[in-house]
Amino acid sequence: MSIASNLKKIRAEKGYSLEKVARLADLSLNTIVKIENGVNKNPTIDTLSKIAKALEVKVDDLIQK
């Protein structure tokens, strides 16, 4: 699985909107949308860390295949 599909799956499991993830991660909505849609396939570790913290998961959960 890609980062995009992992993010989408985890976000859906938590019942979080894209906007909620962006707000909790202190990132722009555009950044979250680009990652989840696969436009940005290589987000920085800082970005991944913020998203993981917002979703209450480990970075590994986002990047695992």
Protein language model features and the residues they cover:
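Short hydrophobic/aromatic patches at helix-to-coil boundaries
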Residues: 1-2, 61-65
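Short basic helix-loop element that most often maps to the first helix and adjoining turn
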Residues: 5-24
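Conserved hydrophobic/aromatic packing and binding residues within compact polymer-binding modules
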Residues: 7, 21, 32-35, 62
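Short, Lys/Arg-enriched C-terminal cap helix and immediately downstream tail that follows
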Residues: 10, 45-46
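Residue cluster at the C-terminal edge of the helix-turn-helix DNA-binding motif
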Residues: 24, 42, 53-54
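Recognition helix of helix-turn-helix/homeodomain-like DNA-binding domains
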Residues: 27-42
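DNA major-groove recognition helix of helix-turn-helix/homeodomain DNA-binding modules
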Residues: 46-61
